[in-house]
Amino acid sequence: MTTTRQAEFDQRYQTHLKHLKLKGLQPKTIEAYSRAIRRMGEYFDWQIDALSSSQLTDYFSDLVATHSWSSVKLDLYGYKFYTQHVLRKPWGMPDLVKPPKTQRLPDIVTVEEAARLFAATRCLSYRVFFFTIYSMGLRLGEGLALRLGDIDAARARVQVRDAKGNRDRLVPLPAPTLSVLRRFWQIHRNAQWLFPSRQGGAAAAREARLPLDRGGVQTTLRRVVQDCRLKKTSPPTVFATAMQLT
Protein backbone atom coordinates (compact mmCIF):
# COMPACT_ATOMS: atom_id res chain seq x y z
CA MET A 1 0.00 0.00 0.00
CA THR A 2 2.79 2.40 0.97
CA THR A 3 4.57 1.66 -2.30
CA THR A 4 1.42 2.55 -4.25
CA ARG A 5 0.97 5.76 -2.26
CA GLN A 6 4.54 6.78 -2.87
CA ALA A 7 4.26 6.05 -6.59
CA GLU A 8 1.19 8.26 -6.85
CA PHE A 9 2.94 10.95 -4.81
CA ASP A 10 6.02 10.77 -7.05
CA GLN A 11 3.85 11.28 -10.12
CA ARG A 12 2.24 14.41 -8.68
CA TYR A 13 5.60 15.61 -7.40
CA GLN A 14 6.95 15.51 -10.96
CA THR A 15 3.92 17.52 -12.08
CA HIS A 16 4.75 20.00 -9.32
CA LEU A 17 8.30 20.35 -10.67
CA LYS A 18 7.02 20.95 -14.18
CA HIS A 19 4.70 23.74 -13.04
CA LEU A 20 7.50 25.36 -11.02
CA LYS A 21 9.74 25.45 -14.09
CA LEU A 22 6.97 26.65 -16.40
CA LYS A 23 6.29 29.59 -14.08
CA GLY A 24 9.85 30.79 -14.63
CA LEU A 25 10.80 30.72 -10.96
CA GLN A 26 14.40 31.07 -9.86
CA PRO A 27 16.32 27.78 -9.32
CA LYS A 28 16.61 28.42 -5.58
CA THR A 29 12.84 28.95 -5.33
CA ILE A 30 12.16 25.78 -7.32
CA GLU A 31 14.42 23.82 -4.99
CA ALA A 32 12.76 25.28 -1.89
CA TYR A 33 9.20 24.63 -3.09
CA SER A 34 10.03 21.11 -4.24
CA ARG A 35 11.84 20.34 -0.97
CA ALA A 36 8.71 21.47 0.88
CA ILE A 37 6.55 18.92 -0.91
CA ARG A 38 9.07 16.11 -0.38
CA ARG A 39 9.23 16.91 3.33
CA MET A 40 5.44 17.01 3.65
CA GLY A 41 5.14 13.77 1.72
CA GLU A 42 7.43 11.98 4.15
CA TYR A 43 5.61 13.46 7.14
CA PHE A 44 2.13 12.44 5.94
CA ASP A 45 3.09 9.04 4.51
CA TRP A 46 2.83 10.38 0.94
CA GLN A 47 -0.79 11.53 1.32
CA ILE A 48 -0.92 15.32 1.09
CA ASP A 49 -3.77 15.95 -1.35
CA ALA A 50 -6.60 16.28 1.18
CA LEU A 51 -4.99 17.58 4.35
CA SER A 52 -7.29 19.06 6.96
CA SER A 53 -6.69 22.30 8.78
CA SER A 54 -5.76 20.41 11.95
CA GLN A 55 -3.26 18.23 10.08
CA LEU A 56 -1.57 21.29 8.60
CA THR A 57 -1.56 22.97 12.01
CA ASP A 58 0.19 19.92 13.50
CA TYR A 59 2.72 19.81 10.67
CA PHE A 60 3.72 23.45 10.83
CA SER A 61 3.78 23.38 14.64
CA ASP A 62 6.31 20.54 14.48
CA LEU A 63 8.24 22.33 11.74
CA VAL A 64 8.52 25.53 13.79
CA ALA A 65 10.10 23.49 16.59
CA THR A 66 12.85 22.08 14.37
CA HIS A 67 13.43 24.59 11.56
CA SER A 68 13.86 28.30 11.01
CA TRP A 69 10.96 30.61 10.22
CA SER A 70 12.42 30.94 6.74
CA SER A 71 12.00 27.19 6.18
CA VAL A 72 8.48 27.32 7.60
CA LYS A 73 7.46 30.10 5.20
CA LEU A 74 8.99 28.32 2.21
CA ASP A 75 7.17 25.09 3.06
CA LEU A 76 3.91 27.02 3.33
CA TYR A 77 4.45 28.76 -0.01
CA GLY A 78 5.50 25.47 -1.59
CA TYR A 79 2.35 23.70 -0.44
CA LYS A 80 0.21 26.66 -1.50
CA PHE A 81 1.74 26.43 -4.99
CA TYR A 82 1.14 22.66 -5.04
CA THR A 83 -2.50 23.13 -3.99
CA GLN A 84 -3.22 25.76 -6.62
CA HIS A 85 -1.29 24.38 -9.59
CA VAL A 86 -1.22 20.59 -9.12
CA LEU A 87 -4.46 19.95 -7.23
CA ARG A 88 -6.20 22.89 -8.94
CA LYS A 89 -7.81 23.93 -5.68
CA PRO A 90 -8.18 27.42 -4.20
CA TRP A 91 -5.93 28.26 -1.28
CA GLY A 92 -8.19 28.78 1.71
CA MET A 93 -5.81 29.13 4.67
CA PRO A 94 -4.13 32.54 4.44
CA ASP A 95 -3.66 32.85 8.21
CA LEU A 96 -2.25 29.38 8.82
CA VAL A 97 1.29 30.62 9.54
CA LYS A 98 2.27 34.13 10.62
CA PRO A 99 6.00 34.45 11.34
CA PRO A 100 7.05 37.16 13.80
CA LYS A 101 7.94 40.41 12.09
CA THR A 102 11.63 41.17 12.37
CA GLN A 103 13.70 43.74 10.57
CA ARG A 104 17.42 43.19 10.69
CA LEU A 105 20.02 45.33 9.02
CA PRO A 106 22.51 43.31 6.96
CA ASP A 107 26.15 43.22 7.92
CA ILE A 108 28.20 45.86 6.13
CA VAL A 109 31.81 45.37 5.09
CA THR A 110 33.75 48.59 5.46
CA VAL A 111 36.34 49.70 2.93
CA GLU A 112 39.12 48.82 5.37
CA GLU A 113 37.66 45.36 6.04
CA ALA A 114 37.19 44.76 2.33
CA ALA A 115 40.85 45.62 1.69
CA ARG A 116 41.84 42.99 4.27
CA LEU A 117 39.58 40.42 2.61
CA PHE A 118 41.03 41.09 -0.82
CA ALA A 119 44.60 40.87 0.48
CA ALA A 120 43.86 37.57 2.25
CA THR A 121 42.32 35.97 -0.87
CA ARG A 122 45.17 34.15 -2.58
CA CYS A 123 43.33 32.90 -5.68
CA LEU A 124 43.21 35.65 -8.32
CA SER A 125 39.79 34.64 -9.68
CA TYR A 126 38.18 34.87 -6.26
CA ARG A 127 40.01 38.07 -5.36
CA VAL A 128 38.81 39.84 -8.52
CA PHE A 129 35.32 38.41 -8.04
CA PHE A 130 35.07 39.66 -4.45
CA PHE A 131 36.35 43.09 -5.47
CA THR A 132 33.81 43.29 -8.29
CA ILE A 133 30.72 42.40 -6.29
CA TYR A 134 31.84 44.66 -3.44
CA SER A 135 32.53 47.66 -5.65
CA MET A 136 29.21 47.33 -7.48
CA GLY A 137 27.02 46.12 -4.61
CA LEU A 138 26.07 42.85 -6.35
CA ARG A 139 24.67 39.69 -4.89
CA LEU A 140 26.81 36.59 -5.22
CA GLY A 141 24.60 35.01 -7.89
CA GLU A 142 24.46 38.25 -9.87
CA GLY A 143 28.25 38.41 -9.98
CA LEU A 144 28.61 34.79 -11.06
CA ALA A 145 26.17 35.31 -13.94
CA LEU A 146 28.03 38.28 -15.44
CA ARG A 147 29.01 37.91 -19.10
CA LEU A 148 31.26 40.03 -21.28
CA GLY A 149 28.26 41.43 -23.13
CA ASP A 150 26.86 42.81 -19.87
CA ILE A 151 29.70 45.33 -19.58
CA ASP A 152 29.04 48.75 -21.10
CA ALA A 153 32.43 50.41 -20.71
CA ALA A 154 31.46 53.49 -22.73
CA ARG A 155 28.58 54.34 -20.39
CA ALA A 156 30.35 52.98 -17.29
CA ARG A 157 27.56 50.60 -16.35
CA VAL A 158 26.78 46.89 -16.11
CA GLN A 159 23.53 45.15 -16.98
CA VAL A 160 22.62 42.66 -14.28
CA ARG A 161 20.29 40.08 -15.80
CA ASP A 162 17.63 38.10 -13.94
CA ALA A 163 18.32 39.89 -10.68
CA LYS A 164 16.05 39.60 -7.66
CA GLY A 165 12.45 39.37 -8.80
CA ASN A 166 13.56 38.14 -12.25
CA ARG A 167 14.24 41.72 -13.31
CA ASP A 168 17.19 43.18 -15.16
CA ARG A 169 18.83 46.28 -13.74
CA LEU A 170 21.66 48.64 -14.58
CA VAL A 171 24.48 49.14 -12.08
CA PRO A 172 27.18 51.85 -12.20
CA LEU A 173 30.62 50.51 -13.13
CA PRO A 174 33.40 52.27 -11.16
CA ALA A 175 36.54 53.05 -13.16
CA PRO A 176 38.81 51.02 -10.82
CA THR A 177 36.57 47.98 -11.28
CA LEU A 178 36.62 48.30 -15.07
CA SER A 179 40.41 48.50 -15.00
CA VAL A 180 40.68 45.39 -12.81
CA LEU A 181 38.24 43.44 -15.00
CA ARG A 182 40.14 44.34 -18.16
CA ARG A 183 43.42 43.12 -16.70
CA PHE A 184 41.73 39.97 -15.43
CA TRP A 185 40.22 39.22 -18.84
CA GLN A 186 43.66 39.53 -20.44
CA ILE A 187 44.62 36.55 -18.30
CA HIS A 188 41.71 34.16 -18.96
CA ARG A 189 40.32 35.51 -22.30
CA ASN A 190 37.07 33.58 -22.03
CA ALA A 191 34.70 34.68 -24.80
CA GLN A 192 31.57 34.38 -22.66
CA TRP A 193 32.02 34.57 -18.90
CA LEU A 194 33.49 37.37 -16.87
CA PHE A 195 34.42 34.83 -14.20
CA PRO A 196 34.91 31.46 -15.93
CA SER A 197 35.09 28.19 -14.04
CA ARG A 198 38.42 27.25 -12.47
CA GLN A 199 37.92 23.54 -13.08
CA GLY A 200 40.91 22.38 -15.04
CA GLY A 201 43.07 25.24 -13.83
CA ALA A 202 43.96 28.57 -15.40
CA ALA A 203 44.77 26.97 -18.75
CA ALA A 204 41.20 25.67 -19.10
CA ALA A 205 39.54 28.96 -18.13
CA ARG A 206 39.64 30.25 -21.70
CA GLU A 207 37.38 27.45 -22.96
CA ALA A 208 35.22 27.10 -19.83
CA ARG A 209 31.50 26.89 -20.55
CA LEU A 210 30.40 27.59 -16.99
CA PRO A 211 31.10 30.39 -14.51
CA LEU A 212 32.83 29.99 -11.16
CA ASP A 213 31.24 27.41 -8.89
CA ARG A 214 28.97 29.00 -6.28
CA GLY A 215 29.99 26.52 -3.60
CA GLY A 216 33.67 27.21 -4.16
CA VAL A 217 33.11 30.96 -3.91
CA GLN A 218 31.09 30.62 -0.69
CA THR A 219 33.61 28.28 0.92
CA THR A 220 36.50 30.57 0.04
CA LEU A 221 34.72 33.66 1.32
CA ARG A 222 33.84 32.01 4.62
CA ARG A 223 37.44 30.90 5.08
CA VAL A 224 38.82 34.34 4.28
CA VAL A 225 36.32 36.00 6.65
CA GLN A 226 37.48 33.64 9.40
CA ASP A 227 41.15 34.24 8.59
CA CYS A 228 40.58 38.00 8.83
CA ARG A 229 38.61 37.49 12.06
CA LEU A 230 35.68 39.52 10.85
CA LYS A 231 32.56 39.00 12.94
CA LYS A 232 30.03 38.99 10.12
CA THR A 233 26.98 36.74 10.41
CA SER A 234 26.35 36.22 6.69
CA PRO A 235 29.66 36.26 4.79
CA PRO A 236 28.26 35.06 1.42
CA THR A 237 26.01 38.11 1.14
CA VAL A 238 27.76 40.89 3.04
CA PHE A 239 29.05 42.50 -0.16
CA ALA A 240 25.60 43.11 -1.59
CA THR A 241 24.95 46.05 0.72
CA ALA A 242 28.43 47.53 0.87
CA MET A 243 29.40 51.04 -0.16
CA GLN A 244 30.93 51.35 -3.59
CA LEU A 245 34.66 51.73 -4.00
CA THR A 246 34.95 54.91 -6.03
Model-derived features with residue positions:
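Conserved catalytic core of the tyrosine transesterase superfamily
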Residues: 1-246
